[in-house]
Amino acid sequence: MLLKAETEIGEYETAEELFDRLAVIGGDLLLKTIDGLEKGSITPTPQNDEEHTYAPMISRETGVIDWSKSAPEISKLICGMNSWPLACTKYKDGILKIVSARVCDENSDKEAGEILALEKGKGLKISCGEGTLYIVTAQFPNSKKMNVEDYARGHEIELGVVLGKE
């Protein structure tokens, strides 16, 4: 290892946004590395094999939401699957792809995955295994990606439907 950089990942930063940010950080780091190698000011350091991690290949199945998980876990999955393959869940007879969501500070005693409400300025409120989540932007079956409030202006969103159910 020649040089390294560290960066925080924002709470709702998507994989695509992080990729773009890391490209800039990586470019700057590459220039510093080349400069340091030319000046002889960089000493290679062996990587600690005990600290390495394995990242499996991402498939469409990776993005399928398990609503029994906590709202923060589901939110992180949604961010991590944006822009491909997008987090998704069964919705009525189709697939709902979720582009963005926000964790809600409320709990629910309803079934995990149940659509609880459509709240103005917040989104579609969903019960999770622990906590609740607002779906903000989504792609409903046979539709394009859009804010869920905009979608609801022209389509009925039935409360009480449980997402992820066959």
Regions picked out by a protein language model, each given a short descriptive name:
Residues M1-C104, G121:
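Active-site-proximal loop/hinge segments within enzyme catalytic domains
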Residues S68-E166:
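An anion-binding loop in the catalytic cleft
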